[in-house]
Regions:
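Solvent-exposed, polar/charged alpha-helical surfaces in well-ordered, non-transmembrane soluble domains
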Residues: 31-39, 78, 82, 104, ...
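Periplasmic/extracellular electron-transfer cofactor-ligation site
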Residues: 34-61, 90, 112-116
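Sec-dependent N-terminal signal peptides
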Residues: 4-13
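Axial heme c-ligation environment in periplasmic c-type cytochrome domains
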Residues: 57-65, 83-114
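Gly/Gly-Pro-rich "capping" loops immediately C-terminal to redox-active cysteine motifs
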Residues: 48-80
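Electrostatic cytochrome c docking/interface patches
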Residues: 16-36
């Protein structure tokens, strides 16, 4: 019973942390999608999409590794839009930060990491 309670508390805590992380992210405006990746997405996914910093160390909230083409290419564009807008696991929701059409325009940036 203790394990279940502790697990539930950890899950709730992780959800709250992910929610708080989203508050610090800038709202998208304009049309510079690469700049938004750099300003917001790279905080967790890294500048190169790997979830690691330039020295190769995992980022504190290392997100999905877009350079893992086996995993990244399994996802449909609609999956990426849904995950980005609604959030998943450690990924905060961006529905208050970006319009669905803007998320769709970010997908080529996400996909280019798996192509390398």
């Amino acid at each position: 019973m203790r394990r279940i309670t502790l697990s539930a508390l950890l899950l709730v805590g992780a959800s709250l942390i992910a929610g708080d992380a989203a508050k610090d992210l800038p709202k998208f405006s304009g049309s510079d999608y690469q700049k938004y990746w750099t300003d917001a997405c790279s905080r967790c996914h890294g500048a190169n999409g790997s979830g690691r910093d330039n020295s190769g160390k995992p980022l504190p909230d290392n997100g999905f590794d877009f350079t893992d083409s086996r995993k990244a290419n399994k996802k449909k564009d609609s999956d990426w839009v849904k995950i980005t807008l609604e959030g998943k696991d450690k990924m905060p929701a961006f529905k208050d930060k970006m319009a669905p059409a803007d998320v769709e325009k970010m997908i080529p940036i996400m996909r280019k990491f798996a192509a390398k």
